Design a protein with these regions (language model features):
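Carboxylate/His-rich catalytic cores and anion/metal-binding grooves
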Residues: 261-281
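Solenoid-like repeat scaffolds
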Residues: 414-420
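Acidic/aromatic-lined carbohydrate-recognition and catalytic surfaces
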Residues: 112-114, 141-157, 245-259
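C-terminal transactivation domains of fungal Zn(2)-Cys(6)
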Residues: 322-381, 395, 435, 439-441
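Short coil/linker segments at helix-helix boundaries
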Residues: 236-268, 304-307, 325-344
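Bacterial Sec-dependent N-terminal signal peptides
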Residues: 1-4, 10-11, 15-51
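Proline-centered turn/helix-capping motifs that create local helix->coil transitions or kinks
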Residues: 277-286, 357-367, 402, 463-467
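Aromatic (Trp/Tyr) and acidic
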Residues: 55-139, 149-150, 165-228, 232, ...
Length: 616
């Protein structure tokens, strides 16, 4: 047996090798079959993802002396429609069909944010005014657009007028609201104290009055934190461009008569915010809310009980900042609004003291719901970091009062890493206000910090825009596309305008204008994202009045959220990549809702450009 062992081992080895070779062959064949199957699936996926080649441009139009960019966009790999060879484009006057300009499309660019390829049509040299189309030989033609002075006047006015349509607790009259008139809803004069909000003389179930203010978004609740960033942005627009806004009319109720329309609108929400402060201790309730969202009905059909809920550091500091800024602005109108500025400042300083006593009071709705009834299921706005709100509030209070205590807080916090403004990130609003109003009162090193940081961010934006397939700052990085992405575009534009005001460098103003072009149609979806504007704009926003009023057109001037690959609403999206994940559906609160904190930066951006591009 021992002598036969080698023969047995050799035979076994041959068999094992044969099995191994066959197995390897089988595995390779299986891998190739799988690979082929994947290629077929990928090809089918691409066909499913195919987007018809189109010309994406600012559907509202262009200023005569400003850059004018349009983008031909189509699916990568498309050989049927997308122009691949050297191709001309033509600008055709709409009323005569005359060609007034021609040029060559730029080279093919591949988007880092989707499956799209693009070619750029640059017609900045065309300064003739009128209505035009762009035509690309053998491909496509654009929507009609205009070249004219004040081309974004309607964008500017409509975006501000949108806040009037969001007013709670009052009827919107036909004289001001047109066909979008409606009855009053949510009087909010009998609001219950939620068990989470009990303090002093305000017991659970006791009643306070907190009428007015703006509905926050597509729902009918009112949130201090989101009002904070919205109000700060609008107040800053007025401070930066006072003489422009003094003469801007939006057809809203006229009282107080001598106060500019933007401040009348701000005042409607300011009075509500002030009513959200506990007069006993200075803390501010997070929101005035139902326990659960109202259904898709008009405001006057809503009769659920309403509550104010737990106070929080973020809400309190937001009021401190807004009220301090409002104090100095409304003190310009002491005759029309006697005592308002003083009331705002008292509220602001009282809020600051509460936030000093409770520096880390987080509004954690999930935790709150484990302890108190009724459970609150509306938007949380649960910020957990407060250095940005504290810096913003300190900046506004220092500018308004000059007091050293706020000066010290600025010194402590000025080096914090503040991000692009949003409801949870307000620090840069302090930078903007200090550069606008506080420059003489801060040190040289603090000025350098503010200026250097803002310019560094702006320069990065401009650099990234040159690599973007649509040549806009928006979309320079994938992270630009999230919930409320269009507000990122508008807030990037504001930052660029702030740096332009510091430096007078034209490239920053051009970058801001490019982001307004993005919002108005120079983007991968081809939509102008503002209701009632352009040739292709949202018809089905997640916005209760627009859904329930029986009118085909949505309430105008509202900025839709924009592409959001998170798709948290689980609605139908035709495309799913960062810059294409948008659904014009009232189901889609993740991409097609509206919100006051998205409209506010649009107001700033559109109106600033109307002023700066027209040498107002």
């Amino acid at each position: 047996m021992i002598t036969d062992q080698p023969k047995f081992t050799e035979a076994k080895s041959i068999v094992l090798k044969t099995i191994f070779v066959f197995t390897e062959f089988y595995c390779q064949m299986k891998w190739h079959l799988i690979h082929l199957s994947c290629l077929i699936c990928f090809s089918q996926w691409l066909q499913g993802q195919a987007m018809k080649t189109k010309i994406c441009l600012d559907q509202e139009g262009y200023y005569p002396k400003a850059p004018k960019i349009a983008v031909v966009a189509g699916s990568s790999g498309d050989t049927s429609e997308f122009p691949r060879d050297k191709t001309s484009f033509y600008i055709i006057r709409e009323n005569t069909s005359d060609t007034v300009f021609s040029g060559e499309l730029g080279g093919i660019r591949f988007s880092a944010n989707s499956f799209l390829q693009t070619r750029v049509a640059d017609f900045s040299a065309l300064e003739s005014t009128g209505s035009f189309r762009i035509a690309v030989k053998g491909c496509c033609h654009s929507y009609i657009f205009r070249i004219q002075e004040k081309v974004h006047r309607y964008t500017a006015v409509a975006s501000l007028k949108a806040f009037y349509y969001q007013r709670a607790s009052m009827a919107l009259e036909p004289e001001y609201a047109g066909k979008w008139n409606r009855r009053a809803g949510h009087p909010d004069d009998s609001i219950l104290i939620h068990p989470s909000a009990v303090s002093g003389n305000r017991k659970s179930g006791s009643v306070i009055s907190t009428p007015g203010g703006w509905y926050d978004a597509g729902d009918y609740n009112k949130y201090v934190v989101n009002s904070g960033i919205s109000m700060g942005t609008l107040l800053s627009a007025y401070e930066d461009f006072k003489f422009y806004f003094d003469t801007l009319h939006t057809n809203i109720p006229t009282q107080p008569k001598q106060v500019p329309d933007i401040l009348k609108e701000i005042l409607y929400n300011l009075r509500w915010m002030l009513s959200m402060q506990d007069p006993e201790d200075g803390g501010v309730y997070n929101k005035c809310t139902n326990a659960a969202f109202d259904p898709m009905v008009m405001p006057d059909a809503c009769h659920q009980p309403r509550w104010v809920v737990q106070k929080g550091t973020a809400a309190t500091l937001d009021l401190a900042a807004v009220a301090a800024q409002a104090a100095r602005i409304f003190n310009l109108y002491k005759t029309e609004l006697p005592g308002l500025g003083d009331s705002c400042l008292r509220a602001s300083e009282k809020a600051w003291l509460w936030a000093q006593q409770y520096p880390e009071m987080v509004y954690d709705q999930n935790s709150m719901n484990q302890s108190y009834e009724p459970r609150i299921l509306t938007g949380g706005y649960g910020d957990k970091k407060f250095s940005d709100e504290r810096f913003w509030a300190a900046s506004e209070l220092f500018i308004t009062t000059g007091k050293q205590t706020y000066r010290e807080a600025i010194k402590t916090l000025i080096d914090e890493p503040f991000g692009l403004p949003s409801w949870s990130e307000t620090g840069l609003l302090g930078y903007y206000s200090l550069s606008r109003k506080g420059w003489p009162s801060i040190s040289g090193s603090e000025k350098d910090t503010i200026k250097t940081r803002l310019i560094r961010v702006a320069d990065k934006y401009i650099l990234e825009s040159r690599k973007n397939a649509f040549l806009t700052v928006m979309g320079g990085r994938k992270s630009d596309f999230n919930w409320g992405s269009n507000a990122n575009a508008a807030n990037q534009g504001i930052l660029l305008i702030q740096v332009y005001l510091m430096t007078k460098n034209q490239r920053y103003l051009d970058g801001a204008l490019g982001n307004l072009d993005y919002i108005c149609g120079r983007n991968a979806t081809g939509y102008c994202f503002i209701t009632g504007l352009g040739s292709l704009s949202p018809l089905h926003p997640h916005h209760r009045p627009s859904v329930a009023d029986g009118i085909t057109e949505p309430v105008p001037g509202l900025l839709a959220g924009g592409p959001n690959p998170g798709e948290q609403d689980h609605c139908h999206y035709e495309f799913h990549e960062p810059e294409t994940a948008y659904s014009d559906s009232d189901c889609s609160y993740a991409s097609n809702e509206i919100a006051i904190n998205w409209n506010a930066p649009l107001v700033y951006l559109a109106n600033a450009l109307e002023l700066l591009e027209n040498n107002f």
